[in-house]
Amino acid sequence: MVRYFLFLIATAMLIAVGPVIAQADNFQSWLTDLRGEAHQRGVSDAIFDAALGDAKPIKRVIELDRSQPEFTLTFDEYLNKIVSKTRAQKAAQKLVEHDEILTEISKKYGVQKRFIVTFWGVETNFGQYLGSFNVPHALATLAYDGRRSAYFRKELLNALQILEEGHITPSQMKGSWAGAMGQSQFMPSSFLSYAVDWNGDGKRDIWGTKPDVFASTAYYLKKAGWNDQLTWGRRVSLPDNFTMDGKDAMTLADKKIRKNLQLWAAAGVRSADGSLLPKANPVARLVMPSGAKGPTFLVYSNFDSILDWNRSNYYALAIGHLSDMLK
């Protein structure tokens, strides 16, 4: 009877362990296939092994990728979470602390200093939290998982290329569970396209070299169409029962509907305090993040550049609000 009981335990253990062993074998086979593709990208065996030699799927990464938030923040809740007085005060201090280098970078790329610091503050709290995940391992997990494997496989190969170029070591390549890296939280593809070696040391170090971080942020925004003659937009007030061209406000709050600022002014749109809109005449569009009963904004082309960085209206408005506190 005891032998039979032990046999049952052993059988159960084999059944439980079997899928794990199979998964591990499949992952190693997948890595072998990836190695060949990495070779074609110029990645050496030494870098591949240093980055992925001990890699295995990270359970927590899968959990985070598949988890759904229990609730959705309202715009006001999100704004209060991201744009605090403490963060604004710290941003103002950073503007003064790094004024010289920020001024140089701002002039070269045509991006206002306050926006560079704002992105830095929102992304990583001014470099204080970069993420603790091993980026190659996290990306390998997501690429192997299969939900968005093609995207993350490309990002993993990009990460290996960054390592091959010597910008960072595998052990130092830390970031978010999804692979966003450094103080600017660039995905590897964004790093390869936009990261800047400002100090000329041969490394585009967005992890530890602040001038590289600032220049990379500014260059990204420049390539996204930033115009330093404009701000991001402004909060506005609408007249009661507002319509324009026979359309109500919610219908007008469409990315495709853009009008010169003075046309909005002629239709009765005013600044949030009731004053007239500026006399400048950039193209603007309505954004109403909380619907008809919430706040209303007129945003300019720079707002779209922010959306290029992060596609959330909440995020872009938070960037705008925090930057306004640094004027």
Which residues are covered by each model-predicted region?
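An acidic, Gly/Ser/Thr/Pro-rich helix-cap/linker signature
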Residues: 24-106
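Substrate-binding/active-site groove segments that recognize
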Residues: 134-143, 156, 181-196, 217
